[in-house]
Amino acid sequence: MLKYILTITLTFGMLTTGAKAEDKPELVIYTYDSFASEWGPGPQIKAEFEKTCNCVVTFVGLDSSVGVLGRIQLEGGSSKADIALGLDTSLTSIAAKTDLFLPHNLETRGKLALPDDVGFWDDPYFVPFDWGYFAFNYDKNRLANAPSSFDELLADNDLKIVIQDPRTATPGLGLMLWVNAVYGEQAPEIWAKLAPKLVTVTKGWWDAYSMFLEGEADMVLSYSTSPAYHLIAEEKDHYAAAGFAEGHYMQVEVAGVLKSSKKPALARLFLQKLMEKEMQSILPTTNWMYPAAASGDVPEGFGDLINPAKSHLFSPEVVAQNRDQWVKDWVEGLSQ
């Protein structure tokens, strides 16, 4: 009889616990796979928000930021996502024109710590959460004399490089913008000069970076902050980013609330918390980027990273106007 009572009690307890969990609203966030991964910021961000939101956060990891935007466009107004996280300023104008995003209605004035080159942040749909520079990374044990400019990189016929596709990966898109910012109308010639040095062009960042780590390339397109991971997490100081005399292209990552969300107030609360100290301080040692808000802390290892004297950043509108032609130039240049 006691066994029977215990069984009924435990079963009822499990059912009520499950019911309570189901009663909590679910906040669905589309992002890129490394953000949502167990070693990315996703799990810590989820735990931090769930402390106070009385909700369940679900990250849906897609192959890239470009993939996030593509998924949202495909699903349209029927998307299950409440938030898109991980787009950057090369995609925000295109994203805004889909008419799938709500204004964030958050005050960012005085709360951000973005470089001066970004200017005053007045985007009504997207709030920044981190930023960094694109750079070619190398292993000092394998490459003693890394190029210090695009011109030196292009002149070295022995270099083996791996990059990403701008149509599918944000770093690849960043390189395309970087080259156009530096060389303008000469960009097609630069792609033709770069082509013989390429081991391959990958779909995503990790595909390229893992090839580099396995010794299949001398340099990989990544971020100026990537060496911080090796230094802080692995205690390895032989990975570095090459500082280029022409300057580096900047990336600012953002998040926005979708019109399809049935929980816009909760989604906006998440964006607000994303700019506060607790979440901002998670990002440098999980997403390996600089925090976008003034409240974020940067660990000691970041002081050893390159600090470009010059940076480049097109407005979202310029990217939207020229992206298709620049992609065409990229394809044709690498095909020569």
What are these regions (language model features)?
Residues 43-59:
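Short alpha-helix C-terminal cap/hinge motif
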Residues 300-336:
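Extracellular/periplasmic bilobal clamshell ligand-binding domains
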Residues 132, 191-195, 201-202, 234-259, ...:
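Periplasmic-binding protein-like
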Residues 90-94, 213, 217-238, 287:
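A ligand-binding cleft/hinge motif common to bilobed small-molecule-binding domains
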Residues 26, 30-42, 63-67, 80-217:
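Extracytoplasmic ligand-binding site segments that recognize negatively charged/polar headgroups
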Residues 102-110, 124-127, 151-154, 231-249, ...:
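Short beta-strand->loop
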Residues 258-314:
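Mature extracytoplasmic/periplasmic domains
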Residues 137-142, 180, 251-263, 273, ...:
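A bilobed periplasmic-binding-protein/Venus flytrap-type ligand-binding module shared by bacterial periplasmic
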